[in-house]
């Protein structure tokens, strides 16, 4: 499955192709950053690359045999020095209407564990691919022609639009994301969702907190 985008990207389901072979848009279902309040409390510069480095040092979930719960329990890393409050929500989570806080541990439907586990791997990808991979919207709201991109997605926005058939919930989430991206591409709506209607102040905050693709 592949579709051509106006920006020169393609959505592909062929796993034998790398993002360098075919420009690809990759949707990942977890938070890419934290609310601005987190940066303020921990006295961090509002800068996403700096955040990635700092977070990985405290929550090294990319290390071998290291899990989020190990870090929470103090057996690895120093997660206690980089925690947040479940009441803190990013602008995009507030705008979505239903997305939970990236600090809301131990509740159904939360992506907090996958967020804490996944952010160090975003740093890994950034180190591996450098400028060859666009992290939206941190590297800019416009994705350069011919470049692959990684975006944050929230399957709950779209999964009810597609019959689940015999898929597991996780399989249906992945199917729904891929199907929506394909439809949005073919209809010309994807370009609009890559540039949501935000005030200058909201856009500046989202450049630090990140944004869920598809949230208007």
Predicted features along the sequence, with ranges:
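RNase H-like (RuvC/DEDD) metal-dependent nuclease/polynucleotide-processing core
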Residues: 1-216
């Amino acid at each position: 499955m592949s579709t051509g985008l106006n920006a020169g990207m393609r959505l592909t389901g062929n796993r034998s192709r790398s993002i360098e072979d075919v420009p690809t848009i990759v949707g990942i279902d977890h938070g890419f950053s934290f609310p601005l309040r987190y940066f303020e409390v921990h006295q961090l510069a509002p800068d996403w690359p700096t955040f990635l480095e700092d977070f990985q040092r405290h929550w090294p979930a990319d290390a071998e045999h290291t899990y989020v719960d190990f870090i929470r329990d103090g057996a690895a890393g120093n997660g206690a020095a980089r925690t947040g409050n479940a009441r803190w929500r990013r602008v995009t989570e507030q705008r979505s209407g239903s997305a939970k806080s990236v600090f809301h541990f131990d509740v159904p439907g939360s992506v907090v564990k996958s967020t804490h586990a996944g952010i160090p791997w975003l740093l890994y990808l950034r180190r591996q691919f450098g400028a060859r991979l666009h992290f939206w919207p941190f590297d800019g709201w416009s994705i350069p022609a011919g470049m692959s991109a990684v975006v944050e997605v929230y399957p709950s926005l779209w999964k009810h639009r597609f019959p689940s058939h015999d898929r597991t919930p996780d399989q249906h989430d992945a199917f729904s994301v891929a199907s929506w991206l394909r439809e949005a591409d073919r209809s010309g709506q994807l370009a609009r969702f890559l540039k949501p209607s935000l005030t200058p102040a909201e856009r500046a905050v989202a450049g630090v907190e990140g944004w869920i693709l598809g949230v208007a």
